[in-house]
């Protein structure tokens, strides 16, 4: 059975100052003369790790990874200042220019699919193709499904833990209730809310329980950046106009794309991918039978696609 490509070290690392106070971490690995591919991580707020480079043949690809504003090795940690979708789109373009890349392939999952689509629609002449997983279009019904009512009926036991930091009288608008705590001055309440938010995501990300995934989401620094940045984006509708990503698909209708989605994705239901595929005739949709949301499940298919 094929697994991820072997671990590789970056051949170049960059610290790129963008809008104050942010400094982005960017690295390059694989072949300096290869086909450029940008790994666009999820969250927002999740950051990259060593596995992010391992979906691509290092002999064929020039692999670029970066930590988006406020997370991973970018600084300052969990900062919400000057942190919007369009700031991140501008960052991607700065990275492309800084590295002297003409066009690149975008490889993004979950929020990474959102951001890849937003970038491609803003800069279609700079994109060669898109490989997207776990499609997230940031529509109101998607936020409601996962953070207010929907997925709660699939995981009532995990949902109870998600609700724990929020008093009953504030549970009518859970995203706002979490946002109040995640941006408040009480650091203990902030961390309690962050872990509840992040662990809800980690526990529901896989079809079969995966303690390693949950542990990763429960780590304090990661939980704080995921929860603060995600909640900041989502209470602001991801800084998108209603249905913007589907509405603007004609801008990238000419670009080839592959959409990979787990049939049993409880975080981003399959109809997200279906709607995107219907709006994008030049795309191919691959539904992974025994998979949920996490990249650890459809990973093998993603490797075959990158080949």
Task: List PLM regions with ranges.
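Conserved alpha/beta-hydrolase "acid-adjacent" motif
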Residues: 266-272
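Conserved small/polar residues in nucleotide/adenosyl-binding loops
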Residues: 303-307
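Catalytic histidine-centered segment of alpha/beta-hydrolase-like enzymes
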Residues: 291-302
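Conserved hydrolase catalytic core segment
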Residues: 102-141
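A catalytic-pocket lid/entrance helix-loop region that shapes and gates access to the active site
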Residues: 127-176
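Conserved HGGG/HGGXW glycine-rich cap/lid loop of the alpha/beta-hydrolase fold
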Residues: 20-76
């Amino acid at each position: 059975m094929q697994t991820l490509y072997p671990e590789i070290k970056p051949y170049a690392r960059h610290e790129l100052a963008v809008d104050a106070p942010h400094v982005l971490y960017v690295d390059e690995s694989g072949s300096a003369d290869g086909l450029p591919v940008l790994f666009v991580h999820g969250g927002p707020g999740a950051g990259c790790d060593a596995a992010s480079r391992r979906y691509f043949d290092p002999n064929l690809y020039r692999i670029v990874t970066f930590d988006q504003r406020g997370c991973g090795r970018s600084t300052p940690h969990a900062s919400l200042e000057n942190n919007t979708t369009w700031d991140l789109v501008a960052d991607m373009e700065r990275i492309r220019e800084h590295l002297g890349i003409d066009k690149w392939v975008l490889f993004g999952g979950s929020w990474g699919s959102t951001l890849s689509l937003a970038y491609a629609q803003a800069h279609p002449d700079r994109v060669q193709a898109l490989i997207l997983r776990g499609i997230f279009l940031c529509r109101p019904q998607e936020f409601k499904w996962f953070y207010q009512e929907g997925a709660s009926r699939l995981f009532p036991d995990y949902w109870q833990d998600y609700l724990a930091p929020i008093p009953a009288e504030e549970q009518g608008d859970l995203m706002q209730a979490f946002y109040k705590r995640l941006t408040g001055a009480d650091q203990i309440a902030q961390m309690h809310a962050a872990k509840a938010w992040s662990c809800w995501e980690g526990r529901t990300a896989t079809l079969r329980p995966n303690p390693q995934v949950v542990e990763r989401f429960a780590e304090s620094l990661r939980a704080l950046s995921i929860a603060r940045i995600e909640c900041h984006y989502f209470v602001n509708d991801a800084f998108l106009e209603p249905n913007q990503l589907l509405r603007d698909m004609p801008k990238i209708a000419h670009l080839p794309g592959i959409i990979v989605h787990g049939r049993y994705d409880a975080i981003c239901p399959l109809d997200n991918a279906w709607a995107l595929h219907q709006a994008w005739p030049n795309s191919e949709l691959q539904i992974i039978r025994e998979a949920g949301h996490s990249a650890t499940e459809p990973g093998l298919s993603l490797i075959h696609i990158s080949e």
